[in-house]
């Protein structure tokens, strides 16, 4: 695993964070050291796939990056005639994802596409995964994407939505942000790295509250919506059609 040192030296002109070749190269290390509970979420995606994925259906991993969630789901799918479609708009991520998927043998076919998830049709889905992806979409595009997902899910299909959250209570919000930064420092990131990455993400990642997510998912049509995992200001929700 290549160590993430992208923000370890001062950057004179710090642009917006993008999922380019450099990020794709270090992404597994970056996300493990940056997102508390990430491994638990990936493991549980496999457990949810085992419960929810049905025969003759599709599974979508929207914003699949290097394929961790796709592989977790794939390892736990035991139903016949299931296909996984992973989509990411970063070509470097897609190339590495394809290599990663090809390294593991499975009877479950996987197709990895380089595309904008807003333009991809969702159909005959028993499971859709949005793992730390929605927060990078413009807020005005989120309802349309979730509506498309809902309409493409079969009855009793599940959406797994993992996100970084913000909190309406300012003191709690600041506390959880501070704890997250402490988590990153404990994982070897310096103050400079934490600060520069935060600045790079400011205009790219726009977070919502848990309540905003719940209301939006229910308004789209999901019958059951619940937070199933949280660590500091990161977590994951399930929404069942």
UniProtKB/Swiss-Prot annotation:
Keywords: S-adenosyl-L-methionine, Transferase. GO terms for molecular function: carboxyl- or carbamoyltransferase activity; S-adenosyl-L-methionine binding. S-adenosyl-L-methionine binds at residues 38, 63-65, 88-89, 116-117, 131, 198. It comes from the Bacteria. The keyword Disulfide bond does not apply. Its EC number is 2.1.3.-. It is an enzyme of class 2 (transferase). GO terms for biological process: tRNA wobble uridine modification. Homodimer. Belongs to the class I-like SAM-binding methyltransferase superfamily. Cx-SAM synthase family. Catalyzes the conversion of S-adenosyl-L-methionine (SAM) to carboxy-S-adenosyl-L-methionine (Cx-SAM). NCBIfam families: carboxy-S-adenosyl-L-methionine synthase CmoA (TIGR00740), PRK15451.1 (NF011995). This is Carboxy-S-adenosyl-L-methionine synthase.
């Amino acid at each position: 695993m290549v160590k993430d040192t992208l923000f370890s030296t001062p950057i004179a002109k710090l642009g917006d964070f993008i999922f380019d070749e450099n990020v794709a190269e270090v992404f597994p290390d970056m996300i493990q050291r940056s997102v508390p509970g990430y491994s638990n979420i990936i493991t549980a995606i496999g457990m949810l796939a085992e419960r929810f994925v049905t025969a003759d259906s599709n599974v979508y991993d929207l914003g699949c990056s290097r394929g961790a969630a796709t592989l977790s789901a794939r390892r736990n799918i035991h139903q016949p005639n299931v296909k996984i479609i992973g989509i990411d708009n970063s070509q470097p991520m897609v190339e590495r994802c394809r290599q990663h998927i090809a390294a593991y043998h499975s009877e479950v076919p996987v197709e990895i596409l380089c595309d904008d998830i807003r333009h991809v049709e969702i159909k005959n889905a028993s499971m859709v995964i949005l793992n730390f992806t929605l927060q990078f979409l413009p807020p005005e595009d989120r309802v349309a994407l979730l509506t498309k997902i809902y309409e493409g899910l079969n009855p009793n299909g599940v959406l797994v939505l993992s996100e970084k959250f913000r909190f309406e209570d300012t003191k709690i919000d600041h506390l959880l942000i501070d704890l997250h930064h402490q988590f990153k420092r404990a994982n070897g990131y310096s103050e400079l790295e934490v600060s520069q990455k935060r600045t790079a993400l400011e205009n790219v990642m726009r977070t919502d509250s848990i309540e905003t997510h719940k209301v939006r998912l229910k308004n789209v049509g999901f019958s059951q919506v619940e937070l199933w995992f949280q660590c500091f200001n990161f977590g994951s929700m399930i929404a069942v059609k």
